[in-house]
Swiss-Prot record:
The gene is rpsT. This is Small ribosomal subunit protein bS20. Belongs to the bacterial ribosomal protein bS20 family. One of its GO terms (biological process) is translation. Keywords: Ribonucleoprotein, Ribosomal protein, RNA-binding, rRNA-binding.
Length: 87
Protein backbone atom coordinates (compact mmCIF):
# COMPACT_ATOMS: atom_id res chain seq x y z
CA UNK A 1 0.00 0.00 0.00
CA UNK A 2 1.29 3.43 -0.93
CA UNK A 3 2.08 5.50 2.13
CA UNK A 4 3.06 8.86 0.69
CA UNK A 5 1.04 11.12 -1.54
CA UNK A 6 3.67 10.74 -4.25
CA UNK A 7 3.45 6.94 -4.07
CA UNK A 8 -0.36 7.10 -4.27
CA UNK A 9 -0.15 9.32 -7.32
CA UNK A 10 2.41 7.03 -8.98
CA UNK A 11 0.13 4.04 -8.30
CA UNK A 12 -2.78 5.87 -9.96
CA UNK A 13 -0.64 6.79 -12.95
CA UNK A 14 0.66 3.23 -13.26
CA UNK A 15 -2.90 1.91 -13.35
CA UNK A 16 -3.94 4.35 -16.07
CA UNK A 17 -0.83 3.57 -18.11
CA UNK A 18 -1.28 -0.20 -17.70
CA UNK A 19 -4.79 -0.01 -19.15
CA UNK A 20 -3.69 2.25 -22.00
CA UNK A 21 -0.66 0.10 -22.83
CA UNK A 22 -2.73 -3.09 -22.78
CA UNK A 23 -5.08 -1.53 -25.32
CA UNK A 24 -2.20 -0.50 -27.55
CA UNK A 25 -0.64 -3.98 -27.43
CA UNK A 26 -4.04 -5.52 -28.19
CA UNK A 27 -4.39 -3.21 -31.19
CA UNK A 28 -0.97 -4.31 -32.44
CA UNK A 29 -1.91 -7.99 -32.15
CA UNK A 30 -5.17 -7.31 -34.02
CA UNK A 31 -3.28 -5.70 -36.90
CA UNK A 32 -0.87 -8.65 -37.08
CA UNK A 33 -3.77 -11.14 -37.04
CA UNK A 34 -5.42 -9.22 -39.87
CA UNK A 35 -2.27 -9.63 -41.99
CA UNK A 36 -1.96 -13.33 -41.14
CA UNK A 37 -5.62 -13.90 -42.02
CA UNK A 38 -5.09 -12.25 -45.42
CA UNK A 39 -1.97 -14.35 -46.02
CA UNK A 40 -3.78 -17.59 -45.12
CA UNK A 41 -6.68 -16.69 -47.40
CA UNK A 42 -4.21 -16.16 -50.26
CA UNK A 43 -5.17 -12.56 -51.03
CA UNK A 44 -1.84 -10.87 -51.69
CA UNK A 45 -3.24 -7.39 -52.33
CA UNK A 46 -5.26 -7.46 -49.12
CA UNK A 47 -2.25 -8.76 -47.18
CA UNK A 48 -0.04 -6.03 -48.62
CA UNK A 49 -2.60 -3.36 -47.76
CA UNK A 50 -2.95 -4.67 -44.21
CA UNK A 51 0.84 -4.79 -43.87
CA UNK A 52 1.17 -1.20 -45.07
CA UNK A 53 -1.43 -0.18 -42.49
CA UNK A 54 0.26 -2.07 -39.63
CA UNK A 55 3.89 -0.98 -40.12
CA UNK A 56 3.45 2.54 -38.69
CA UNK A 57 1.63 1.09 -35.68
CA UNK A 58 4.44 -1.39 -34.99
CA UNK A 59 7.06 1.34 -35.39
CA UNK A 60 5.21 3.70 -33.07
CA UNK A 61 4.82 1.11 -30.32
CA UNK A 62 8.50 0.19 -30.60
CA UNK A 63 9.50 3.85 -30.44
CA UNK A 64 7.36 4.41 -27.35
CA UNK A 65 8.74 1.31 -25.64
CA UNK A 66 5.55 -0.75 -25.51
CA UNK A 67 7.23 -3.54 -27.45
CA UNK A 68 10.93 -4.16 -27.93
CA UNK A 69 12.24 -2.67 -31.20
CA UNK A 70 13.60 -6.07 -32.22
CA UNK A 71 10.16 -7.63 -31.77
CA UNK A 72 8.59 -5.03 -34.05
CA UNK A 73 11.34 -5.55 -36.62
CA UNK A 74 10.91 -9.33 -36.41
CA UNK A 75 7.16 -9.07 -37.00
CA UNK A 76 7.65 -6.74 -39.96
CA UNK A 77 10.37 -8.89 -41.50
CA UNK A 78 8.56 -12.21 -41.18
CA UNK A 79 5.20 -10.89 -42.34
CA UNK A 80 6.77 -9.10 -45.30
CA UNK A 81 8.65 -12.27 -46.28
CA UNK A 82 5.41 -14.26 -46.17
CA UNK A 83 3.68 -11.66 -48.35
CA UNK A 84 6.54 -11.65 -50.86
CA UNK A 85 6.49 -15.47 -51.00
CA UNK A 86 2.86 -15.44 -52.15
CA UNK A 87 2.59 -16.11 -55.87
Amino acid sequence: MANTSQARKRARQAGVRRVRNAGQRSMMRTYVKKIVKAIVSGDKSQAAAAYKEAVPILDRLARKGLVHPNKAARHKSRLNAQIRAMS
